[in-house]
Each structure stands twice: as C-alpha cells, then as structure tokens.
Amino acid sequence: MVQWLAMLQLLWLQQLLLLGIHQGIAQDLTHIQEPSLEWRDKGIFIIQSESLKTCIQAGKSVLTLENCKQPNEHMLWKWVSDDHLFNVGGSGCLGLNISALEQPLKLYECDSTLISLRWHCDRKMIEGPLQYKVQVKSDNTVVARKQIHRWIAYTSSGGDICEHPSRDLYTLKGNAHGMPCVFPFQFKGHWHHDCIREGQKEHLLWCATTSRYEEDEKWGFCPDPTSMKVFCDATWQRNGSSRICYQFNLLSSLSWNQAHSSCLMQGGALLSIADEDEEDFIRKHLSKVVKEVWIGLNQLDEKAGWQWSDGTPLSYLNWSQEITPGPFVEHHCGTLEVVSAAWRSRDCESTLPYICKRDLNHTAQGILEKDSWKYHATHCDPDWTPFNRKCYKLKKDRKSWLGALHSCQSNDSVLMDVASLAEVEFLVSLLRDENASETWIGLSSNKIPVSFEWSSGSSVIFTNWYPLEPRILPNRRQLCVSAEESDGRWKVKDCKERLFYICKKAGQVPADEQSGCPAGWERHGRFCYKIDTVLRSFEEASSGYYCSPALLTITSRFEQAFITSLISSVAEKDSYFWIALQDQNNTGEYTWKTVGQREPVQYTYWNTRQPSNRGGCVVVRGGSSLGRWEVKDCSDFKAMSLCKTPVKIWEKTELEERWPFHPCYMDWESATGLASCFKVFHSEKVLMKRSWREAEAFCEEFGAHLASFAHIEEENFVNELLHSKFNWTQERQFWIGFNRRNPLNAGSWAWSDGSPVVSSFLDNAYFEEDAKNCAVYKANKTLLPSNCASKHEWICRIPRDVRPKFPDWYQYDAPWLFYQNAEYLFHTHPAEWATFEFVCGWLRSDFLTIYSAQEQEFIHSKIKGLTKYGVKWWIGLEEGGARDQIQWSNGSPVIFQNWDKGREERVDSQRKRCVFISSITGLWGTENCSVPLPSICKRVKIWVIEKEKPPTQPGTCPKGWLYFNYKCFLVTIPKDPRELKTWTGAQEFCVAKGGTLVSIKSELEQAFITMNLFGQTTNVWIGLQSTNHEKWVNGKPLVYSNWSPSDIINIPSYNTTEFQKHIPLCALMSSNPNFHFTGKWYFDDCGKEGYGFVCEKMQDTLEHHVNVSDTSAIPSTLEYGNRTYKIIRGNMTWYAAGKSCRMHRAELASIPDAFHQAFLTVLLSRLGHTHWIGLSTTDNGQTFDWSDGTKSPFTYWKDEESAFLGDCAFADTNGRWHSTACESFLQGAICHVVTETKAFEHPGLCSETSVPWIKFKGNCYSFSTVLDSRSFEDAHEFCKSEGSNLLAIRDAAENSFLLEELLAFGSSVQMVWLNAQFDNNNKTLRWFDGTPTEQSNWGLRKPDMDHLKPHPCVVLRIPEGIWHFTPCEDKKGFICKMEAGIPAVTAQPEKGLSHSIVPVTVTLTLIIALGIFMLCFWIYKQKSDIFQRLTGSRGSYYPTLNFSTAHLEENILISDLEKNTNDEEVRDAPATESKRGHKGRPICISP
C-alpha cells in the first residue's frame, strides 16, 4: 500500500515533468508551501500584486490572480533570453497581441515572431511595447493597459521581480563556437528553461543555442560552478600536483568580455600567467591548434595599468618583440600568441578562443591581505617613520636605482618593497608629507622574458601599476620601478634616472602596545572603528546613541579595503552593515549624514546594479560580495552598524569642496557653482563618431575625461546644455564616462575619472547584457547601457581651474556656439554695424538672424552673461525711413519680432538706423548704425528638405530602351560572346545610337541600373576612364561614385600582373551576386573584350504622350527576381504591418541581396514614403533578424554608426534602413509572398571522429579546424585521416551556410583552403575529384589564368566571401567535409503540449498507463532509479568524451540517433505550422 501511495505521488510528479517543469522543482512542490531559496537561486519567482497581495497564475487561455499561499507550477515565472517572461508550468512566454490589445494577456510559444514577447521592469511595473503595462481587471484577469500597477516577487521580504535577470551562458565544447544558450529551447517536444542532462551520457549539463534543437542541432555544455569544488571535473585539466585547473576553449569564438564572463560563471577567471613554467604548461596543451587565445591580461581600469582579471600580481611579462606603441596604447585586452608564446594587445571586441583558470586554493591571499590592515604600534630611530612593525625613511638625495639600493643597504635597510594596499596607502601619505612626487622602490628586472623581483628577496604578491604600465623599454635589459605620489601607482623607468628613494627596515613592537582606541575598537590611521552587531534600522543606527559620534564615512579605496578586512571576520552570507550614506530626503543624490560639518562624497564602492533607487540608505554587504555597497529601506530594513571616531581630537581639515570661480577656458561651458566645465563633441563638429575608448582618449588629449556627474547639479546642467544645442526631437546619444569595463570591479558601474557615483543613474536597469559595459546619455536625463565598441558622439569634462591642452591635430576654431543646426559667434569688441556686416561675411557667415522664440531665448541666455561687454548687441536687422521696409541683412523676411515698446513711440527719422538686442531684457531696439557695439554672427548648415524638381516634362524612349529619371538607358549584355565589347567598342555603339556610355549622377540611378543586372553573369562598361576619373565621358563632373573598396583607383589590384600596371583602364560595373561587389565600380583594361555595357541618352520630349511607367499609379503587386512583392498602404505599426501582410498570404519583406535592395530603392523613391520591412531585433540592436526566417549578411543601414532607436526597421525613400520603435506609425509596408518549397529529406547523421561535425543537408562539416593553420597538403591529409575531404563548395546554398558559420569566428579566421586544383594544361580550375567548379566566386574579376605561378592553391576569403589564389605552402585554416554516414534510427515522434490541445481524459489515461509501466519496470529493476533514462534495443550510439585532446569534442547527443526520418505526418504538415515565422499560437494548458 505504501508503494502505491508513493506511486501516486510519482504520477503527479511525472505530469509536472511532462509540462516542462524541472524535476527538482516538481519535488519541491510536493512538500513546501512557500517559495524556496532553490527557486530563487534558479531565477524562478512568483509574481505578486503589491496592492492586492495575490499572484499571477497562467490558466488555459488567460492569466488570473490567485491566492499566493497555494503555489503551483503555473505560478512560477522566470526571465529568459531576449527579455521574455517564461511560465514554468505552462511552458510558454507572456505575450501581448498588438493587433488585439483588448484581449487578456496569455502565453505564447517563446520563439513567436508575431507577438510582442519583450518586457522590462520600471519601478516595479512590468512594461511592454507602446507603454502598455501588466494590469488587472476587476474580474482578476491579467491584461495590458497604460495604467500603473506594481508587482513584486512573492517572498518573505517582497523582493524585486527583476533581481534575477537572464544572463548569457556561454557554451563550452559542442558545435556552437561558444555561443550563449537560448532559453527556453525545445528538445524532444519539451521546452527547457534551464540546462539539462537528458540526452547526454556523461550527464553533463548542456543547452541548445537556438530555440529548437532538432531544427538546428547547435549545442554546447553549460558552465557549472558547482562541478569542481575540490577537484578538476571533465571539462578542466589539472597542472600536475597543483590545485590549479585550466579549461581550453579552443573551439569558441568570443569577445574578451564574453570570455571573461564565461570563466566567472564557472568560479574561475581568464588565464593569468605567473611564470615561465606555467606558460610552458599552457603552450604544450595548445598544440598549435589555434593562432591566438584570450588571456586575462587587460588595462580596462582607467585609473590603473595592465592587470590580470583574477587579481594575480603582474610581475612576469612576455610581450611580443614585434608589438608597437600604437596597439599597446589603443588595444586594452591581452592575448597569448601560440607559435611564439608571446603576448599581444588586441581590440577587446575581437572574437577569439580563450583559456579559463581556477585556483582551488584561492583563500590564502585573502588571509594575508587581512593581516596587513591590522594596527601594530611601532618604535623607530629618529627621522624614520613607523608603520605596521616596519620603519621607513624617504631620502631626498637623488640617485640612480642601483645607487639608491646601495645607499639603503649601507644603512642596514632595503630599498622599499610593497606587499599590500595598506602599504601603498602609507607610501602615498609619506610622499605627501614630504612633498615628494616620485620615488624609487625596490622592484626591478634583469631577465628576458621580463620578471620583476624585489631587491629584498621577498616574493612579489602585489602589484599596483600606473596607466599603460608596465611599459617595456626598447633595447633595455634592466628595468627599474618607481612609485608616484597621487595614488601610489608604479612606473617602469630607466634605471639610470635619478630620483628620491625610500629605505625600509624592521621596527620595534612594544610588548604592551596600545592602539589609542577604546576596547573593542580597531585602529586604522587616525581613526577607530567598531562593529555594532545588533540589528537596527538606519534611523536607530544613525541617531548617535548606539554609534557615537556617527556612522562610518569612507573616503578612499584604502579605507574601504580596511573596512572589508574588518567585517570579514563577522560577515556571513546575507549580512549587512549600515554606513552614513543616505538619500532620506529623496533628492536623487546620496550624501554622508554627519554631525556638524558637511563631508563631501569622495569615494564609492557599489555592488552590481547599485545604487538601485533613490531615497534609500546604504549598507556594506558581507558574504560573496564582501565590502560592496547596496541601497536598502531606511525604516524597515535591519542591519548591523559600522561606527567611526577619531583617535583624538584633530584639527579637522576643511573638507568642503572648493568651488573655483575661474571662468571656463575657451569654448568649454559651465554654470555658476559647478567645479567643472563641459564640452559637447557632436557629429557636426568632428570627423566621425567614436567608440567609448576612442572618445575617452579624445578627451584625454585635452587633459580631460569623458563627462561624469559628481553632483546632481552637474547632470542637470549637461541636460540643459544638450537641450540648448539640439532639437528635442533629435534622438542623440552621447558617450559619458559611466562604465563597468574593469573586470576587478565585480560588474559595478563607475566613472572613468574616478568621481564617486552618487545617484541612481540606472534605475531598474536589470537587463544589462555582458556586451554592454559603457553608457550613453540622452537629453531626457536617461543613461542607457551600450556596447563600448558602438560609435556615438561624446561629452568631455575638465576641472574649471585646469587649462585644456591643445593636441597637434586640433584645429582651433573661433568659439562658435552650436544651437539646432546653426552656430553663433559672439564678438565682444565693439564696432559699427557695417563693420560687423563685413566681418561676418568674411567669416563665411551672416549677421545674426532670429527666426523663433526659442532662438531668441538661446541668444538672450548667452549675452546675459556677457553684459559687462555691453548692454546693446548688434543683430542683422536694419530699417530705413519707412517702418514697414525692414528685413534681415541676408535678405530673409522678418517672421519673428521682439521689439521694446519704446520703438513704437520713436519719432521717424530719415537717418538709417540699425537694430540691437538688449542683454538685460532681450528686447529689440534701434540705434544709430555708427555707434560701436558688440555683435553676433551666425552660420547655418542648409538641409535640403525637398526633392529636386524635374528639369523637363516627362518624355519617351526608343523601343528596347528603359525610361527612368527623365533619361533613357540601354542595358546590353549579348548572349553571343562574340558580340561582347571593349570599352571603346561599347562607347562607339552608344554614340551610334545617339547617346554615350552611362553617367550615373545619384544613388537612385545606380539602383535602377543594378536592378536591371539581376541574373546576369557579365559585368558592364560605364562611362569613366582612369585618365580622367573625375569626369564622365560625356563631360559631366563626377558627383556620385560607387567604387569597390577592394579596387582603389589607380592602384593595381591583387589580380593585376606586372605587365598590366601601365595600360589604360576603364570603369566597369559588377553584376556579381556577392553583395560585397554587386553594382560596385572598378577599373580594368579598356581593351579587354568580354563585357556588356550600359548606354544612356536624353529622353524624347517632342512627342506629347507621357511615359506611363513613370507617372501612373504603382500597382499593389509587383514581380521582380523570382519574387512577388505586395505594397500595403495606410498608417500602421510594425505589428499591424505584419498582420496585413499575412492577410495577403505574404510576409513583411526580407531583403536578401543588393539586387532586391536596388529594386526596392527605386520602388520606394516612386512611392515617396517610408515603409516597414521585416527586420527586427530582440536584443536591443545587437542583432537584427528577418521575420520570415531569411538569413543573409546583407545590410543597407543609412549609417552603420546610427544610434539604435527601436526594435523594428523601415526603409526610407532612398531605400536606406533605419531602426525605430515597433509601435511607430508609418505610411505603408512592403510584403513579399513566401514561396512554399517542399523540404528535401537528408537522412543520415554525422559519424564521430576526433573532431566535431555540423550537418547541413546531406553533408557533415568540421569547423573546429578553421583555427588550425596548416599548409594545403597537411590540411588535405588531415581530412583524409578523418575519413573526409577538404572543403568543396557545390552550390550557392552551401556557400551561404559556410559563410554564416565562419562569420561567427570574427576576425580570428580570414581564409580557409578549398579542395581545388588548377590545371595548367587547359588553364581551368577543377575540384580534386575531377568535377568542374560550377560554383565559383572570384569577386570583381576572374584572375588572369595565363599569368599564374605554377600550381597555385585556392582559399575562401571569409570577410568578402570570395575565392583567391595563394601559395600552397601558406598556413591557412581549413574545413573537412564528408557525407552524412550514420543511418538515422526510426522513432515515433513526440508531441509537446505546446502543439496540440489534449483532452483531460486522454491525458489521464496516458498518465495511468505510464504509471503502470513504471511500476512494472520498478519491480523488475528493484533498486534502479525510477527516473533513470530508459534505453531500448535501438542500438543507440553513446560517444565517449576525451578531453585530453585539445580539439576532441562531443557533437552527437543521444537523441540525435532517435530522429524519425520517415515521419510523414510532420513532413506533410502545412507550411504555416512548420515555419518559425508563423508561430503565434497561444499555448493552452491542461487544468
């Protein structure tokens, strides 16, 4: 009977498992009624209404509010990929149907493209598109409305539902190149919101990297921090008998930050290298499989130098001898070069393999650091300074490093060594007290590779390098180190340089040492500190009664380090300690609550995503985030307290911030009371937008930094400054110094200039992807995390009393002030009105004109501060004798006036009078033009806002010619090769027809010609020659060009042979379907035959009939290039556009190549309105995808550096793409009818060898070898040893698949070998099996086969996707290819609940039947695990892992062999059910 009761419980658990809930959570639900800690650790929570105290439960077709005290699996939620909210019990994501907003919210399949599934938190609100928020109706139904409703996580403390965001898990091994997991993913019919072990023999956690594993078969193992607490698990390797583990991720391709994040998730860090022995161990395990790998070396802390990401001291250096100063300064992340085992600096956004390291003995350094902060009273000889049982003496007789060493040794001391941050603090204070700026310390190196050692013989356990240090001086074997006063940082110096130096020796510690602090208090510097262990509210702790005289204030990183060591002895998990920082008045700025004198905030040490909100009080945290600061509720939260009091009554130094009254230099700007000046560098004034690091370097050239806001008043000023310069409707984003680049800063945000973070700049910004480590500022007081490599404008900040430097490249311009697309120059030296009219003209500007009240306000605000130069300022207005004859000096009409009343009473005068503006009132008046006054000039950049009018009326063209843009075009590509022409022959043909070779004056004409080259394989002559490439053959100037970047004018290309370099060249337009070259221009031999051509001539206007094609209405259905397009007209959102397309049995248009783009460019120009296209993003603009599933690398953005402005894309009237909010209303959409193609079955699976394989159609490919550089012959032999062949490309689909996979490796791979050979006899290229190369891609021109060197080999150049000849001895990556060899095993298909509605009775029957089967099996097995995976007699293949081989990976999951290749039901399913683009069905849930 007991067994049957247990079986009933198991039956219920089995039902939960079928619904997709994790086994462990299902077990929890059987015996707990409150949300468990395990749920929270997995990121699962229950959503509770803050006001109603009820919780959201997913029902059959609606969401309702239910009693929270009876939790079930349908109440469990989790944030998953792309900001989706996943319901564990319902196996679906919360979605909003934009087309039916009145409907209640419900669950949808998580990869649906027809429903809005993205949500974000905003002050306890759950907000979706169109500002719709999760709300509740009176019947407790959950709906979307624009009213506010607040939600919290149902826990004992009522946490925030966004405290557990979805984080990218970067996969290990597998075949996904390290790409992050996608959650949820579907496997065997079930959706999984977490990594699983099912289907994997070794029971390691794994995930898919696309939403449906069976469709793409992309997967990898999950990082698991719990897998190696005391030993190295299967994915790690151990270094001999040490307790250090290494993980070689040589098939991954990640940026430095992504690699760093991957290692951190496993409890490790990117590789640090302590010495040559460790480097030798690493080199032996790389086996030259890859060229370069990421290591933990970086200089991402703007205030420090090079460092290891795990905090290991940087004393061993092995920089490559070839490294130049440029990359060393510009690139901030380090790599290990495999062949030379030397280090290089790289752009951190490059994608490379990486190595993780984990030290199982990581606590030893923490114990040592804690001891260094303990106070010890010390006695020293006269003139020596005591500190922590040692005595120090700064000697001011300047000596070389060796001289300093001998001098100290002669006094029975050593040249100072530094073993801790506590000693750095003492060093800084000693230098300040002695008024010294720099000193020798005892660190030096006399080795190659460089290995710094202390002259005292002590171990190097701590380093503290200055920015860009340690720099290895060229041609110097001996290197010596100094320390500077400002922050104690170290620099590498020439040992012969003469500096001050510090000697160090042992001191005397008295037996009865007294710290000077009361009992129970600890001393640090001049203060005593104590922990009050009683839990109190902030009001109680800060009252002065329990913590006398006050709570702790922290002023520096040194004091913070001391506090961290102090609380480490009592800090347990989830322990907190009050400090004096607070924002109780809800001002938005955190300040110290002190008794008496105000103390400014000089330093902050926030935890990740802190400060989370305004109006709170601050605690220091214990446990895993030891020492970090967090905001808590001042009244309700209880914590211990940190107290601070001076050792004795000192004369306190004035700590009030001094406000310098020096005006800002040059054209930097500030406001009264601010200690800093700011300058906005916007696109109108600089050559290009810049990345965050480039912008910071730009500011540093002026002696400044990217802007920081040390006070809320500074942010207010910058916001007003931006409003004064730019139209508020402009979506501009500016880099500021806010960043979290420093890997040692635990993911917390900081200012690049070291200013304290005093405000909650990123309220509820929980969705901060690993790639977004820098912040941009918008003019609505909003900070947005952004990818540091993206390009933006920027703002610099400099202290008011610091004079900016002027870099050599800086071209000083008079201090013009920018305001809404115009600039203004204020001349403070008075002169007559006529003089300034001449001066403004000489400066290529106009006398000031004022066209609006806003411009009037801007001018008045500026001259108000310049009143000392004069009250009256000339403007560009004059009047004659008659009052109504008044106009601006540039001839424009007066459309805005702001006259003083006195003007109306003025007596008319025949004398000419000129107009001024008052700096006091802003009103206008008149004055004698000869009176000298200050004045204002204005220069305007004219923006064209209307199309050019047609030069003539529409005409006609001869038969066979194409009419476009009031010209006639003839595209001629003869089918008979004998009729193809030279450039001269083509020009003669065109002249004979009354025209010339084409001259292209605009992007629109270029698009028209390009669209008419679709399907052609022959390039065409156009009317340009190299002898005069600035004029067309018809004499018109070249005002538009479309040259190929790979074919620069007058520079021989890589295919050019020696005898071709001096022959005449003429221009061709490429018809190559590769979008890198489609429509591009390039030069070739004018005398070469074999090309088509394009003629043009003027239209015929003698006849009066109008060309119908150019003026008639555009039909709603158009055919082009094997596609059918439909035009939808009317105002609509992106979602409504998609719905309208589907009503026409179509999809929002995808644009796969340059030909279709050219067609749509011409079409949109005719339509005259912007139109939606099918492009959208779910990751804040990192990647955009086509809604119909099309995958193409082709893009046509207006500006690749454009700011990300929304999740959906449209095409403008020039065809260019822009992003905008999906809820915006545009005037139409472009659809295309999707052709339903029957999917071909490609049976068989990839066999397992020493490399992993990815299947495409009927073949398997090894991409792990692309990082293994070999000669052609070695690569060919390697593939043969694997039972495969070197890559041969048979068709365009295969070529697209290969490029998509290869582009994931980024810049790590440039070329791979192709299995082709050149036949010298007949000058042709053939595959190695003898078949011809029907699929080829030579780029702009085919190589000259007659002048090739003997026996060349062929590579695929990945960035352009073209083929290229290269010597066979070169070392390149390669891909092996073979037919899918393992036959698929027949299995019955599984159907998940998300695909059908299962009646309750049938479900119960199946559960009962399954229960009986499980009971029988349990009786048979007796001791077997009831949930062990059952395997029948299908002959399933279980691959064995062997991680000792660097490139040996597992790529076949057990389930791969259980595919049903004969499933006719699935094969014949309607297209609307099988295509991802049509997944918008709600998920129905069984009760």
Curated annotation (Swiss-Prot):
Family matches, as InterPro entries: C-type_lectin-like, C-type_lectin-like/link_sf, C-type_lectin/snaclec_domain, C-type_lectin_CS, CTDL_fold, FN_type2_dom, FN_type2_sf, Ricin_B-like_lectins
SUPFAM superfamilies: C-type lectin-like, Ricin B-like lectins
Keyword Cell membrane found: yes
Domain Fibronectin type-II: residue ranges: 176-224
The Ricin B-type lectin domain, residue ranges: 42-165
Segments in the Cytoplasmic topological domain: 1418-1487
Effect of disrupting the coding gene: Mice are viable, fertile and without evident histopathological abnormalities. After challenge with bacterial lipopolysaccharide (LPS), they exhibit longer survival than wild-type mice. They are also resistant to lethal effects of exogenous sPLA2-IB/PLA2G1B after sensitization with sublethal dose of LPS, suggesting a potential role in the progression of endotoxic shock.
Protein name, entry field: Secretory phospholipase A2 receptor
Species of provenance: Mus musculus
